[in-house]
């Protein structure tokens, strides 16, 4: 039985839109205002970061990562990426191999869109998080195995101005007892960043089957 990997251009668009939405959430301080609303507290003005001054690091620059990079470049963000193999992508500075620490330290926002492999398992651990900027944010839309969740929880508790936008977890659905639900600097979505649209997926598989 042949195995077909679905490359859905519309999924790429959905993933990119989700990423942009969470970047704007962080960039425009919406999470702070949301938490203030819950407390009935008028927090006052906060100056947002301009696009050109925000460096977004894409961890895993494959098919979907490229969609994110293209959208962010159009909007004048500074886009960098880390990937396993060397590559040239227009308007994206690529980091590889041992340069991962430089990639982490250069990013205001890190978007993890890594696949689940032995090499990516718990790649975002205590050391990784320690090298992220104090007021930065992490978006995970790849696979839950990429994050060592205990390390992330500890980092979030110790750094109130660090934000995490999490669409995937090691075990889903996320248990109601999980500490992630309780943290004010966490936004959780139920694995919806790249929902597969049935009709285009069926058409894609059929086109490959005919070949």
Where does each model-flagged region fall?
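Gly/Ala-rich phosphate-binding loop of Rossmann-like dinucleotide-binding domains
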Residues: 69, 73, 156
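Active-site regions of enzymes building and remodeling cell-envelope glycoconjugates
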Residues: 1-3, 90-99, 183-188
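Active-site capping/gating segments
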Residues: 6-11, 165-175, 193-199
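Glycine-rich NAD(P)-binding loop of Rossmann-like domains
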Residues: 33-67
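NAD(P)-binding Rossmann-fold cofactor-contacting core
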Residues: 74-91
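Phosphate/diphosphate ligand-binding glycine-rich loop within oxidoreductases
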Residues: 1-34
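Adenosine-phosphate binding glycine-rich loop
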Residues: 174-175, 182-204, 208-209
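Rossmann-like adenosine-cofactor binding region
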Residues: 86-179
């Amino acid at each position: 039985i042949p195995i077909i990997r679905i490359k859905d251009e519309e999924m790429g668009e959905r993933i990119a839109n989700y990423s942009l939405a969470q970047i704007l959430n962080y960039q425009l301080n919406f999470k702070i205002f949301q938490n203030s609303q819950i407390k009935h507290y008028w927090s006052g003005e906060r100056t947002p970061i301009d696009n050109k001054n925000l460096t977004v690091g894409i961890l895993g620059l494959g098919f979907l990562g490229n969609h994110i990079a293209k959208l962010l470049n159009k909007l004048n963000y500074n886009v960098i990426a880390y990937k396993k193999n060397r590559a040239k992508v227009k308007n994206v500075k690529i980091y590889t191999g041992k340069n991962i620490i430089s990639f982490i330290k250069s990013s205001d926002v890190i978007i993890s869109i890594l696949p689940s492999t032995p090499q990516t398992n718990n790649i975002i651990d205590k050391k990784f998080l320690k090298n992220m900027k104090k007021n930065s944010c992490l978006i995970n839309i790849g696979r839950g195995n990429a994050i060592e969740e205990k390390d992330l929880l500890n980092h979030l508790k110790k750094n109130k101005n660090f934000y995490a936008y999490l669409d995937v977890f090691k075990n889903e659905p996320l248990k109601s007892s999980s500490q992630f639900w309780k943290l004010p600097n966490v936004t959780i979505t139920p694995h919806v960043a790249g929902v597969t649209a049935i009709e285009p997926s069926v058409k894609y598989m059929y086109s490959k089957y005919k070949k």
